[in-house]
A protein has these predicted regions:
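Juxtamembrane inter-helical linkers in multi-pass membrane proteins
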Residues: 46-57, 122-140, 258-264, 276, ...
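Select transmembrane alpha-helical segments in multipass membrane proteins
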Residues: 22-27, 63-71, 143-161, 203-206, ...
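Membrane-interface loop-to-helix entry segments
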Residues: 24-31, 36-48, 170-177, 199-247, ...
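Loop-to-helix junctions at membrane interfaces in multi-pass transport proteins
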Residues: 129, 133, 161-164, 169, ...
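Helix-loop-helix module between adjacent transmembrane segments
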Residues: 28, 32-33, 73, 102-127, ...
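N-terminal alpha-helical transmembrane segments of multi-pass membrane transport
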Residues: 1-78, 88-95, 106, 246
């Protein structure tokens, strides 16, 4: 059953992240970057300012810093570490180049998503702020496109349940725990006809309980928990990355050369150069979108 599920997910992944969608997403980012006159460069200082200066006043249920931490919580670690490693394994070092490209132009896309989410957000009867793609599709494009908003909601739920919304994070956590405590899978338990390492089961239960305790508190509790955990995650992640870079400075130029050569298939044989470049683009841009853009446009309105 597990192998069948993996095959289905792989087929869906290959279909969705085909070249047409890759080109559409990349050129959308380029178009928005041009129309916004390089927003990600012109307002970099302002963006960094709001990283270190919190705004408690204004509309919404959480502070600006809380919104930032909530947005980053879904990408730091799983997206940046697991996502990058997966992209390199699947597409080679060249995938990193396309990740950088997708991340740069994706900043403009992310800004546009956030702006639309805030512009078309609504206040529910209980006082909570609601917003996201399904709201700005319906309100921005008109009542005739309400079906598209519902379709987005359905597929978004499926992605959240069976894709990057839960599977990636939980798999990353449980795999790390299992590799530390029981890498040889000596201690196992049978569940639903499959054998699982006890450490994986225990880690899964703990993650479920902790996530449940946070989620039942609503967006305010999610924001408060993110404000505590995410800064530690970010500082640790950036610190470790800098340590690795500075302890391997002599290898940095060669690494950049390898990334560029692999990105354009320059090291591949003539017949496979286009194929190597295509794989690097697909894996790099897909993981770049996950690790840099995330899904914060749903949380932005609050």
């Amino acid at each position: 059953m597990l192998n069948t599920l993996n095959d289905v997910l792989n087929n869906v992944d290959n279909f969705i992240w085909g070249m047409p969608l890759i080109i559409l997403i990349l050129f959308t980012g380029i178009l928005l970057t041009v129309r916004l006159r390089g927003l990600q460069i012109r307002h970099l200082g302002k963006a960094l300012h709001y990283v270190f200066h919190n705004e408690d006043d204004g509309e919404g249920e959480v502070t600006s810093f809380g919104a930032l931490c909530t947005a980053l919580s879904a990408t730091i670690g799983t997206g940046n570490i697991v996502g990058c490693a997966t992209a390199i394994v699947a597409g080679g070092p060249g995938a990193l180049f396309w990740m950088w490209l997708a991340a740069f132009f994706g900043m403009a896309t992310k800004y546009a998503e956030g702006m639309l989410a805030v512009k078309y957000r609504v206040i529910a009867e209980d006082g909570h702020t609601l917003g996201g793609p399904f709201y700005y599709i319906e309100k921005g494009m008109g009542k005739n496109f309400k079906w598209l908003a519902k379709l987005f909601c359905v597929f978004g739920t499926m992605v959240g349940l069976f894709g990057i919304g839960t599977f990636t994070q939980v798999n990353g956590i449980t795999s790390a725990v299992n590799n530390f405590f029981d890498p040889s899978n000596v201690h196992t338990i049978s569940l639903f006809g499959m054998n699982y390492s006890i450490s994986v089961v225990v880690a899964g239960i703990i993650v479920t309980i902790c996530a449940g305790l946070v989620i039942i508190g609503g967006i305010k509790r999610i924001s408060k928990v993110s404000e505590v955990i995410v800064p530690f995650m970010a500082v640790t992640y950036i610190g470790v990355c800098l340590i690795i870079v500075f302890t391997h400075l002599p290898q940095v130029p060669a690494a950049f050369a390898e990334i560029v050569q692999s990105a354009f298939g320059l090291k591949a044989v003539a017949g496979g150069a286009i194929g190597a470049m295509t794989v690097a683009m697909q894996k790099g841009i897909a993981r770049g979108i996950f690790s840099k853009i995330g899904r914060a446009h749903v949380r932005t309105p609050v």
